[in-house]
Amino acid sequence: MSKYQINCIRYRHFLRTSNISQIPDFTKYCIGPVNEELAPYIMETMKAYPSNSEYINPQHYYHNRTVLVENYLKRSPNPVSLTQLAQYYDDSTKLTRTKIINSGKFVKEELVIRIAHKLNQLQQLPFNVVNNFHFVQVYESYYNIFESFRKYPTIRTLEDASQFADFIKNMLEGFNTLNLPHLIMGALECTILDLYPREKMDQLLSDLLRARISRRLIVEEHVSITANYTSGKEENTLVLGDIFQECSAKKYLLEASEESQKFIQDMYFKDIPMPEFIIEGDTQLSFYFLPTHLKYLLGEILRNTYEATMKHYIRKGLEKPEPIIVTVVSNDESYLFRISDKAGGVLHDDENLWSFGKSKERAQESLNNFHKLPGLQTVSIYDEVHSHTKYNSKLKSLQSITLKPYMHTSLEPMSYPSIINGHIKYETPLIELLKRSFRYKLGIGLAMCKVYAEYWNGDLSLHSMPGYGTDVVLKLGNLMKHTKKLQLDKV
């Protein structure tokens, strides 16, 4: 073949693959000419490994291959029931030394396997998705969990199990608390940039969130039974363990209504007329549930309902706001809350309501508000944490640099309660999202609620009549009917 023919082939290949292995033209991304002072930073942002990363480095591929892929990915997670988590196979609510030790062994091994499979799920994503700043934070955090639990010494004694429970609390109260907002911000950014189909992104977040609930449930159950046993308690509450409580539907509805009214007063003014809040149906209903999740679900839904009702009241110039009516219904299998308003119906498309990505315009609006939330700046919390050698010094540095200016104010960062409180709070990030100011419209409330409702064998649906109003129907499964059902990322 002549040199001319070879050059022709090369030229045709260049025309077909002009964007492969070529130096990027950064000028097309700039408003004006390239500033030479910025040139050194291009290498920093384009290099293969993040700065100060404890896990993503030149050795990561080989370590990941030999440890995660060739070892832990060959093991399957164990589906468990609520009964097993509380009883550990001896079919009683009695707390014993053996039960606590077996619980610790199971949690240590199971969490490593489960987080390994989620790491692999992230690794299978397109590079420009998993390389997103927020997904990198989640990946770093997951690998931190994987390595920390994998390397933790074998649990053989009650003292080992007790120390393991303390270790778990430190993990949950540390920098892993920001995984939830980082997951959502990463999804929003990928939607805006067209990096991943919206349907696939919604499924990815749903999978990761359900797995997150399961992991925290397993961990919290072990912390609970260990604390109970070491404090002298001899028996768990019922078969579900003490992290589940008997919840009064009316009490939680009234609390959610009160918080929503405070939200409206903050949004407008203190003495603004409030809609009448009416509870109908099975008003005396009490059922066993995870208190924080019930508070979040009812709070998020009522917050939206109150906001829509008040906007309708002002827009129409009504004499007083229309009432909000909650109908409570129950049977042997499930509990149902129907929240009805007369606020004119929902304006957005149905597909946008249940999506984390939404349209590009709404995704950008949500992302902007996420970035305004105190404690969620785009500076990585992991960079600060990893720059210190001891856990306590990490927390003190974080508090003084990031948290102190907002302490005891309405702008207190979302991460603060989880990081420094002396006792563990289950799903603190959820409640902090719920407490956000009206200024921060995130647009992911219903999508989040649907994932959590489905996890608990329920559902969330919305029925809107344009020009009249909306019914939001929250269904939750009866946990006492599903205590022995084996599931992986669902009850």
Swiss-Prot record:
Q: Pfam families given for it?
A: BCDHK_Adom3
Which InterPro entries does the record associate with it? Answer: AK/P_DHK_N_sf (IPR036784), BCDHK/PDK_N (IPR018955), BCKD/PDK (IPR039028), HATPase_C_sf (IPR036890)
Q: Which UniProt keywords apply?
A: ATP-binding, Kinase, Mitochondrion, Nucleotide-binding, Transferase, Transit peptide
Which Gene3D superfamilies does the UniProt entry name for this protein? Answer: Alpha-ketoacid/pyruvate dehydrogenase kinase, N-terminal domain, Histidine kinase-like ATPase, C-terminal domain
* Biological processes annotated in GO: regulation of acetyl-CoA biosynthetic process from pyruvate; regulation of glucose metabolic process; regulation of mitophagy
Enzyme class per UniProt = transferase
Source superkingdom: Eukaryota
Which annotated residues bind ATP? 300-307, 341, 359-360, 383-446
Q: Where is the signal peptide?
A: none
One example of the protein's molecular function in GO is: pyruvate dehydrogenase (acetyl-transferring) kinase activity
Query: Under the cellular component aspect of Gene Ontology, which terms does the record hold?
Result: mitochondrial matrix; mitochondrion
Q: Which reaction does it catalyse?
A: L-seryl-[pyruvate dehydrogenase E1 alpha subunit] + ATP = O-phospho-L-seryl-[pyruvate dehydrogenase E1 alpha subunit] + ADP + H(+)
Location in or out of the cell: Mitochondrion matrix
Q: What is its EC number?
A: 2.7.11.2
Sequence ranges assigned to domain Histidine kinase in this UniProt record: 153-480
* Additional record remark: Present with 450 molecules/cell in log phase SD medium.
Subunit structure, per the record?
Answer: Interacts with PKP1.
The entry's family comment says:
Belongs to the PDK/BCKDK protein kinase family.
Cited function: Inhibits the mitochondrial pyruvate dehydrogenase complex by phosphorylation of the E1 alpha subunit (PDA1), thus contributing to the regulation of glucose metabolism.
User: This protein is called what?
Assistant: [Pyruvate dehydrogenase (acetyl-transferring)] kinase 2, mitochondrial
Q: Tell me the organism.
A: Saccharomyces cerevisiae (strain ATCC 204508 / S288c) (Baker's yeast)
